[in-house]
Amino acid sequence: MKGKAGKFLTAAAVAAAAGVVLKRMRDQQKEQEASRIRSIEEAVMNNRDYGDRQAYLIGGGLASMAAAAYLIRDCKFPGSHITIYESSDVLGGSNDGGGDSGKGFVCRGNHMLNEETCENFWELFSSIPSLTNPGRSVTEEILNFDHAHPTHARARLVNRDGKILDVSSMGFHSQDRLALLKLLLTDEKRLDNLTIQDWFKDTPHFFTTNFWYMWQTTFAFQKWSSAAEFRRSLNRMMFEFGRIETLEGVTSTPLNLYDSAIRPLEEYLRQAGVHFEKNCRVTDLDFAPGPGLTVKALYLKRDNGEQAEGEARYIHDIRQMKDGDICIMTAGSMTDGALLGDLYTAVPGKEEPFISAQLWSKAAARHLELGNPERFFSKCHETAWMSFTVTCRGDQMLKAIENFTGNIPGSGGLMTFKDSAWLLSSTVPAQPYFAAQPKDETCFWGYGLYIQAEGDYVKKPMRDCTGQEILMEYLRHLHISEEEIAQLMETVVNVITCYMPAVNAPFEPHRCTDRPQVVPAGSKNFAMASQFVELPKELVFTEEYSVRAARTAVYTLMGVNTPICPVTPYNRRLKVIFRALKKAMT
């Protein structure tokens, strides 16, 4: 028997080794074929004569900037023939970040990168030079920094008593696990208009688990968010399921994403001759009559920079498009209508218009194939939350947080006060976090999901609070003395708050037809790229979504045959599945 068992094990080992060798051979063949296609495509693009063809990109966020980079790098399109229109005076869209030592610093959002699942992001930025490390790409710079500053949260969840919870267990009951498994196995099309709460209506315990609090605040889900998007997150981020309690999969950047990624990308585009028209809003599109989808003209509204009232400060213009020109539009923005407050001032009560969504709505009203923006931008009470960026003199504030969490700046990922009325979370990055940040100042960032609720200590809704009040609420959840809080508040330069009414709009429940295709059916020269277009299997609210959409738009309109980096199917890899199952059983 022992001899037979030995022979069986030997045969199994040989078969396994043969399988590994075969897989390597197949991978090598795939890479060789991909390299051959790239070489052919490059030769074709090098021989193209674009003449006077122009590319007009609407919106100055990551999607448009990535599209411009792909046009230049992969299509050999002249940078001087590319124009990016941005309605504000800052590029980067939702990836903004800036300020100064006098007024403090601010990031409206804080976007998570992940080494395993940002395939096109890393590929694009591998060709964008770093601004601070000559000879290195942005991708190399970020990943080198991240590997030197690993994340391992020691205080992922904190209860109402200020106790750091043991989150090694996900806290599931059997019914929770069955509902999760059933969701993963359900066809996405059957989840039209369903919320997460709808799906787990028979197991409300799910919303009390450690897993829910951690997954919710990592990705900014609400109970009323789309069940389909929640399902996508589970599939796309299954690699992270097994380590969600430590956030080891979070990829840290040397500075905020604006300074670490947007500024180098902007410099790359400027060096290539791309035109940026800031403070210039595209108010409408003119489509050619008849079948198909062809943009004929863009209607522009430029701020003339003069101190004038109303329409007197704007110049209206029309940009006619010729045969061969292309237009790529940012369809909706998560930070549309964002409002800022500061240490002593709450954000304004008056809502601002959703500029990007308005343009999308006008286009969709004429062409039904352009999706349904109303589905995403009509319920601010469901899609709004607030962030706050704290700037302090010295490191006393950060030391107090470090003493509580056990994490030095840059190592803790996200900390969530799970029982707080506003569901407050914060992250303390490695310092400095802004390019212009002085050595004697420190910053950290936080956000609250339940902004209409009355605070636990400050008895008013977060939406109505000043930066000072929000920080006081936060510090009291650390359960430190009033005397120490007073000392810490003396070091504060500013707390810039940001109300974002549409930030969770991509997670709104919707039908599978509500998001348009990147290049709509019948389009001759028009594409859309944003968090609101349809990218099968991809997860919204990520940098990868914007870059993948941009690459899809450019390659389709320009006839590029080089494959786009696919969504890596971690949810089909046995090792990843087993690790996730093991975590789910804890």
Each predicted region: which residue ranges?
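Glycine-rich FAD pyrophosphate-binding loop
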Residues: 72-99
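Glycine-rich Rossmann-fold phosphate-binding loop(s) that bind the pyrophosphate
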Residues: 59-62
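C-terminal segments that line or cap access tunnels to active or ligand-binding sites in enzymes
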Residues: 239-251, 324-548, 555-566
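Active-site-proximal substrate-binding core of FAD-dependent oxidoreductases
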Residues: 556-586
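Conserved FAD-binding subdomain of flavin-dependent enzymes
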Residues: 103-143
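Rossmann-like flavin
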Residues: 131-236, 251
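Extreme N-terminal leader/targeting segments of oxidoreductases
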Residues: 2-55, 73-80, 579-586
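Helical element adjacent to the flavin cofactor pocket in flavoenzyme catalytic cores
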Residues: 235-326, 331, 357
